[in-house]
């Protein structure tokens, strides 16, 4: 058919405009993100009724199809538009299974345009489906034969629920009287997979059912263990004797499979599994229970820390410490004789001697009354309160000491021989104190409530006294700060009892060595100045005893006045309330007063006048070092934001605390112990006038105790702060004395 020129020109203009519009639409679609639903938006991109065989994806296919259509239109030029016949592009589609509704996985919203439908015009959009057909399960042909079927439930779980992670409730297995051939049928779903194993055999012979069940169980165990081990990332070898499977598989948040089931689990446990978790809270991720490696077991079990060499070392300390203290004290009881003596152990079995000479009822009653009075004063008198993170402490040792000194002075003024009574029964009081330490430790071990809480409601138990060994726990104490009715700290009571006892002994020796003259007859012109001068010129005293007792008094008053510095010490915060601590508190007064007692009984003269000055200077130096270091640490623990700590050097720890590197704490690790040791050496220095071993060994025991405590504190800090303490140790290498210890 022929067309006029005008008609042809109109067709050409129409085709050009149509091509430009389609090109503009294609450019817009190429510039913006494509969605799957955009395939049906253009009139030229309608899907054909027959599927295309072009192997392209959705987005690529959309662009390709659009480009192909535009090219075909441009090639046609001014020719007349024709519609392609559907029969030319018809391709017989291969048989495909019914896939059902496709699950939408895109997070984008659905398009408002309807599904793709064939319009019968234009080229079709080739789309390749990415869904694979399910692989059919091969079936094994069965041989008809007489069958005896026996069903047994194997006690194990093969798979887990994929939606909830919970295990299957049952696992059924049917076994037949043969082990030669078997058919395995697997039924799977979206959530649970259950295996059913059937073994069919020919013949009517008897078959060992237990043997078949055992072989099936072993094979399934190996397959399940291999599957779960591959999922976990670590191969696990299981044996029949060393493997038993749990009812659910827990997923750990750790990669090393050393996390417990409590760490993370997506399963829904039943009642039986909850009982198992209560019995064993730390189980490996591994599906087996008994196939854990020794390395995993060692990581699970936390060994109790050991001090003093275990139970044997603790037993030797409990036996030798009170014996040594009593022997050294007993060796210097007689006048003009302070030397080692032979022990008569048979006296310990003589009940009459112990009753008449040692445990006299009047002396025992006085000692018990003294302890009760000190306890009441500690509980009732006000004191300085120090608020720390874990506990609030009250320190009133100074008030207790002043009260007892005033009461003793009044009693002495009223002609009650308090000083004479105290010094006469010095050795008996030493025995009573050592025995009382064992009694108090036993009472604390058996009767004190171990569930007392501090201000943060945390138990104050001693980890080093929870070993399970009676000797170790009794020696080190199961608690840190037990309290009576939540008010009186037993450790502080024993500490103050030790300080007050030492103070009383020092004042008694000073009072006893001073021989006051009779009261002068004052005239009308003489006043108080004349009276003071009279006593100064006529008083009699022993210089060595007075000097030694004065040094001891100065040493004890320093500890009493600055008692609140104890709140940041190792002794109050970390030392357990055990028998060893109580023995030290009971023995300290008699070890410290051994030198003063020696000078009081031996009457040793001072041969050189500058000796007291050297001793006083050494004592002042030691107390200054001790007090400065303790005060520095106390103020920092109490308020680390103080301006005096603005530019100090510290090491941060993972526990939130800091290790001091400034002041004396950056010079040695325990400067307070260094000052205490120097002060003790000053107390023992007067023994150079007339040496004697028992008093010197008594003070040496306290020095050895401080050295041992420094070692214990270093070990505990190493176990607590780890790498932070390692860095601190590299900078501060010495414990007490630089380049020596």
Curated annotation (Swiss-Prot):
Q: Which residue intervals make up region (Disordered)?
A: 29-126, 160-194, 231-277
Q: How does it sit in the membrane?
A: Multi-pass membrane protein
Q: Modified residue Phosphoserine is at which positions? A: 111, 144, 223, 225, 243, 246, 248, 250, 263, 284, 291, 298, 640, 642
Keywords (A to Z) from UniProt? DNA-binding, Membrane, Nucleus, Phosphoprotein, Receptor, Transmembrane, Transmembrane helix
PTM sites of type Phosphothreonine: 135, 234, 237, 266, 288, 293
Name its cellular compartments.
Answer: Nucleus inner membrane
Q: What's the main place this protein lives?
A: nucleus
This protein's source sits in the domain of life called Eukaryota
Q: Where is the composition biased (Low complexity)?
A: 57-84, 109-126, 185-194
A single GO molecular-function term is: chromatin binding
**Compositional bias segments (type: Polar residues):** 160-184, 231-240
Segments spanning the bilayer are: 308-328, 363-383, 402-422, 429-449, 497-517, 543-563, 577-599, 604-624, 687-707
**Cellular compartments per GO CC:** nuclear envelope; nuclear inner membrane
Bias (Acidic residues) ranges: 267-277
User: Per the UniProt entry, what is one GO biological process?
Assistant: sterol biosynthetic process
Q: Which Gene3D superfamilies match?
A: 1.20.120.1630
Q: Which family does it belong to?
A: Belongs to the ERG4/ERG24 family.
What is the stated purpose of this protein?
Anchors the lamina and the heterochromatin to the inner nuclear membrane.
Query: Subunit composition?
Result: Interacts directly with LAM.
Which PANTHER family does the entry mention?
A: DELTA(14)-STEROL REDUCTASE, DELTA(14)-STEROL REDUCTASE LBR
Protein name according to UniProt:
Lamin-B receptor
């Amino acid at each position: 058919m022929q067309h006029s020129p005008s008609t042809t020109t109109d067709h050409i203009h129409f085709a050009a405009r149509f091509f430009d519009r389609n090109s503009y639409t294609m450019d817009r679609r190429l510039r913006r993100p494509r969605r799957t639903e955009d395939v049906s938006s253009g009139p030229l991109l309608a899907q054909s009724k027959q599927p295309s065989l072009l192997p392209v994806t959705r987005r690529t296919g959309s662009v390709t199809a659009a480009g192909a259509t535009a090219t075909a239109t441009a090639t046609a030029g001014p020719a007349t538009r024709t519609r392609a016949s559907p029969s030319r592009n018809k391709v017989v589609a291969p048989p495909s299974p019914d896939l059902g509704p496709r699950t939408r996985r895109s997070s984008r919203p659905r398009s408002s345009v309807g599904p793709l439908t064939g319009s019968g015009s234009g080229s079709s959009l080739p789309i390749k489906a990415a869904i694979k057909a399910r692989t059919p399960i091969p079936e094994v042909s069965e041989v008809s034969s007489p069958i005896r079927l026996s069903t047994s439930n194997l006690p194990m779980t093969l798979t887990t629920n994929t939606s909830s992670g919970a295990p299957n409730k049952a696992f059924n297995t049917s076994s037949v009287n043969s082990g030669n051939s078997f058919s395995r049928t697997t039924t799977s779903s979206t959530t649970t997979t259950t295996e059913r194993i059937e073994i069919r055999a020919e013949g009517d012979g008897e078959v060992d059912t237990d043997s078949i069940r055992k072989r099936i169980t072993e094979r399934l165990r190996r397959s399940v263990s291999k599957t779960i081990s591959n999922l976990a990332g670590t191969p696990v070898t299981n044996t029949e004797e060393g493997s038993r499977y749990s009812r659910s598989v827990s997923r750990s948040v750790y990669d090393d499979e050393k996390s417990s089931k409590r760490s993370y689990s997506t399963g829904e446990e039943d009642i039986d599994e909850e009982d198992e978790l209560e019995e064993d809270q730390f189980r490996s991720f591994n599906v087996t229970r008994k196939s854990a490696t020794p390395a995993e077991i060692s990581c699970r079990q936390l060994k109790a820390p050991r001090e003093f060499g275990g139970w044997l070392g603790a037993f030797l300390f409990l036996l030798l410490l009170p014996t040594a203290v009593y022997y050294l004290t007993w060796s210097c009881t007689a006048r003009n004789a302070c030397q080692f003596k032979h022990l008569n152990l048979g006296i310990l079995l003589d009940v009459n001697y112990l009753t008449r000479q040692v445990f006299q009822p009047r002396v025992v009653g006085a000692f018990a009354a003294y302890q009760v009075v000190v306890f009441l004063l500690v509980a009732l008198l006000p004191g300085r309160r120090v608020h720390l993170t874990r506990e609030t402490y009250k320190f009133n040792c100074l008030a207790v000491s002043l009260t007892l000194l005033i009461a003793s002075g009044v009693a002495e003024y009223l002609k009650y021989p308090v000083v004479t009574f105290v010094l006469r029964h010095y050795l008996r009081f030493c025995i009573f104190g050592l025995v009382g330490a064992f009694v108090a430790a036993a009472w604390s071990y058996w009767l004190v409530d171990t569930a007392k809480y501090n201000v943060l409601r945390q138990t104050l138990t001693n980890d080093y006294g929870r070993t399970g060994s009676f000797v170790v726990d009794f020696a080190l104490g199961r608690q840190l700060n037990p309290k009576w009715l939540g008010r009186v700290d037993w450790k502080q009571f024993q500490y103050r009892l030790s300080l007050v006892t030492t103070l009383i002994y020092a004042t008694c020796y000073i009072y006893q060595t001073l021989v006051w003259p009779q009261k002068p007859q004052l005239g009308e012109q003489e006043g108080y100045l004349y009276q003071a001068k009279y006593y100064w010129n006529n008083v009699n005293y022993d210089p060595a005893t007075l000097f030694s007792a004065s040094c001891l008094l100065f040493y004890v008053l320093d500890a009493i006045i600055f008692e609140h510095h104890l709140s940041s010490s190792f002794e109050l915060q970390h030392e357990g309330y055990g028998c060893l601590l109580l023995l030290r508190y009971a023995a300290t007064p008699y070890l410290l007063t051994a030198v003063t007692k020696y000078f009081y009984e031996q009457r040793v003269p001072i041969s050189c006048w500058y000796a007291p000055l050297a001793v006083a200077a050494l004592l002042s130096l030691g107390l200054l070092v001790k007090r400065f270091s303790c005060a520095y640490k106390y103020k920092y623990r109490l308020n680390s934001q103080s301006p005096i700590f603005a530019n100090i050097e510290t090491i941060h720890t993972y526990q939130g605390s800091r290790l001091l590197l400034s002041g004396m704490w950056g010079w040695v690790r325990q400067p307070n112990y260094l000052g205490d040791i120097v002060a003790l050496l000053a107390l023992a220095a007067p023994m150079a006038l007339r040496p004697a071993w028992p008093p010197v060994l008594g003070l040496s025991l306290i020095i050895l105790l401080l050295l041992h405590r420094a070692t214990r504190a270093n070990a505990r800090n190493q176990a607590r702060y780890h790498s932070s303490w390692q860095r601190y140790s590299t900078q501060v290498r010495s414990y007490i004395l630089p380049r020596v210890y």
